[in-house]
Amino acid sequence: DVCSSDLKRCLVHFAVGTEQVFMTTRLDGENTRFFPFNKTFENIGVKSESGYRTSYLWEEVLRRDSLLDLLQNFMTVQVDSEKKYNAAKKKFDEEISEALIFPRYHQRRAVHRLVDDVQKKGAGHTYLVQHSAGSGKSNTITWLAYRLSNLYQHAEDDNALFDSILVVTDRRVLNEQMRANIRQFSTVDGEVYAIGQGKGVEGHKSTDLKNAIEKSKGRIIITTVQMFPEIADTISFFPDRKYAVIIDEAHSSQSGENNRQMRKALSLEEATQQDAEDEAANDEEKKL
């Protein structure tokens, strides 16, 4: 167990064998739910000089610097509210629940690999993170957004590498879920600027997105891909700015006109080059 006297509770509990690791942040008797903390599926193929497939836990994860990184950049208390019917009072009461969030191994690894590579190579590169259903994609996106928003490529740099982090979804429901998740991790007022429908947003229209990008409102901007076509031709162009764009459900949202307009809004030069490449590819296809 990794414990904290400040929180007066254990932060995480590990169940460790010679082949697999499982973790939970809450012990609840027979109802305890453990999650895999393996490097691969059931740690198949994992090799170690010690002979134990699980040695990465104490050799890598439980190191002093790693624990400090987990406490500073990953762990948080997630607060959820749910309305439940109170039969005695004959009305719905709001129940508040708290849960400690601790990253699973693949989430921690994904964030570290991306941040390390971006710090090494700088802006302008493309990455793909593959997540299966139920593997914590929203938290991975959230951790990555916050790490990139405060990333300095070199120790002597005066400014962060990226001017803004844009988290883009392709559906309203996903936007609301992502917005709520990212706000849970926020500790600074004005750090997050959300554009969408419903409550808890700073803007509702595409013009709000335009202003947020032009005036750098919020280190992290959350929006939907459908907002970009309406501003692609009117947004001001800042050639010296850099954006990190994190796209949820990229397999379904990164094709067609919406994606092209998003690239145009954020980088006119890149979009023009891409359009030329697309036209050339279409011409070749017609010849065939």
Predicted regions and their residues:
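Conserved nucleic-acid-binding Ia/Ib motif block in the N-terminal RecA-like helicase ATPase lobe
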Residues: 164-168, 172-221
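ATP-dependent helicase/translocase motor core
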Residues: 1-164, 173, 177-188, 219, ...
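Short, solvent-exposed coil/turn elements at secondary-structure transition points
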Residues: 19, 198-201, 228
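Generic enzyme active-site microenvironment
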Residues: 15, 168, 246-247
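Conserved RecA-like ASCE ATPase "motif II neighborhood" in helicase/translocase motors
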Residues: 207, 211-249, 253-267, 271-272, ...
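Short, functionally important structural connectors and interaction interfaces within domains
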Residues: 94-95, 201, 258
